[in-house]
């Protein structure tokens, strides 16, 4: 079944480029940039990839991202991810990147963007993988900081297809960012946002009604609110669900408890994605395979999930 799932044409709509930084590349970049790491070797680092919640993961994620310093680093990161896409027949990807993760430590916005954009361009030309980049605001920072990031992005308007919202969800509701999303949409950006991963269904309502998003990233807690479910089904609002991430971060205790197939059968436009694959134990095919192994996902369900991902593209 793995090989069949791997060959299935699919799109990835929820992927953080910084979260695809495999330990081997992390160590190579640290050596290239002469950065001392708190881990002795790759295996020690992999052993640290055990998380009880989103915040524990984010603490390690931001620590790992510190090795990314130059255009070449960001190119290598993105190119390595695109090669994974090619190997798994991901024909289209819409990755997030978090400029504030890098600008806050003194890396110029254009350094980050140039490296990523060149790799995506090469991916289109050399690998045949279409793509669109999503600029994501960090919700644990202030809305003023998000405005500054948008200011930095506007000269490179054509490099992005959308703005997003990610990082620590609890205590940072979507309404905190209503003004910057209003401004981004007025500049022509489409909006997406993480909501309903650890946060309650109310956060999904806010993302839809205040941020006016076109796609919900995660959204698994929508199933707790029947009125919300009806709206998502009726309006066919896509959900970019990340099964391995959800179990690794204890949103669900075990994959057998995941609700993605229940949502699929109710008519929700759910998609399968890897989120931060270097940290969560698998790329898109591994996520599909986990659904087959633990939830008994059928070939028909896999085809529908893959088609949903292609239908839910922003471009």
UniProtKB/Swiss-Prot annotation:
GO terms for molecular function: adenine deaminase activity; zinc ion binding. Its EC number is 3.5.4.2. SUPFAM superfamilies: Metallo-dependent hydrolases (SSF51556). The active site is at 197 (proton donor). Belongs to the metallo-dependent hydrolases superfamily. Adenosine and AMP deaminases family. Adenine deaminase type 2 subfamily. GO terms for biological process: adenine catabolic process; hypoxanthine salvage; nucleotide metabolic process. It holds the Pfam family A_deaminase. This is Adenine deaminase. Transmembrane segments: none annotated. Catalyzes the hydrolytic deamination of adenine to hypoxanthine. Plays an important role in the purine salvage pathway and in nitrogen catabolism. Binds 1 zinc ion per subunit. Substrate binds at residue 276. The record marks 218 as: Important for catalytic activity. It catalyses: adenine + H2O + H(+) = hypoxanthine + NH4(+). Its cofactor is Zn(2+). One of its GO terms (cellular component) is cytosol. It is an enzyme of class 3 (hydrolase). Keywords: Hydrolase, Metal-binding, Nucleotide metabolism, Zinc. Zn(2+) binds at residues 14, 16, 194, 275.
């Amino acid at each position: 079944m793995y090989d069949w799932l791997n060959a299935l044409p699919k799109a990835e709509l929820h992927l953080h480029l910084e979260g695809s930084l495999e330990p081997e590349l992390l160590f190579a970049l640290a050596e290239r940039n002469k950065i001392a790491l708190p881990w002795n070797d790759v295996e020690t680092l992999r052993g640290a990839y055990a998380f009880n919640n989103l915040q524990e993961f984010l603490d390690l994620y931001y620590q790992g991202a510190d090795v990314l310093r130059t255009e070449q680093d960001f190119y290598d990161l993105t190119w390595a991810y695109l090669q994974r896409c090619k190997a798994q027949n991901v024909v289209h990807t819409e990755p997030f990147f978090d400029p504030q993760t890098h600008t806050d430590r003194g890396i110029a916005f254009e350094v980050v963007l140039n490296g990523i954009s060149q790799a995506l361009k090469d991916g289109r030309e050399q690998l045949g993988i279409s793509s669109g980049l999503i600029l994501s605001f960090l919700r644990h920072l202030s809305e003023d900081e998000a405005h500054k990031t948008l200011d930095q992005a506007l000269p490179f308007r054509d490099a992005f297809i959308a703005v997003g919202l990610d990082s620590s969800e609890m205590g940072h509701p979507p309404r905190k960012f209503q003004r910057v999303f209003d401004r981004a949409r007025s500049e022509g950006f489409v909006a997406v946002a993480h909501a309903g991963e650890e946060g309650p269904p109310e956060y999904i309502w806010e993302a839809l009604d205040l941020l006016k998003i076109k796609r919900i990233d995660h959204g698994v807690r929508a199933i707790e609110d029947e009125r919300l479910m009806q709206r998502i089904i009726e309006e066919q609002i896509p959900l970019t669900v990340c099964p391995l991430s959800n179990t690794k971060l204890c949103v669900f205790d075990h994959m057998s408890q995941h609700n993605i197939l229940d949502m699929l059968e109710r008519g929700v436009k759910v998609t399968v994605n890897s989120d931060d694959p270097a940290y969560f134990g698998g790329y898109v095919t591994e996520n599909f395979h986990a659904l087959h192994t633990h939830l008994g996902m059928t070939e028909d369900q896999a085809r529908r999930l893959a088609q949903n991902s292609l239908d839910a593209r922003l471009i």
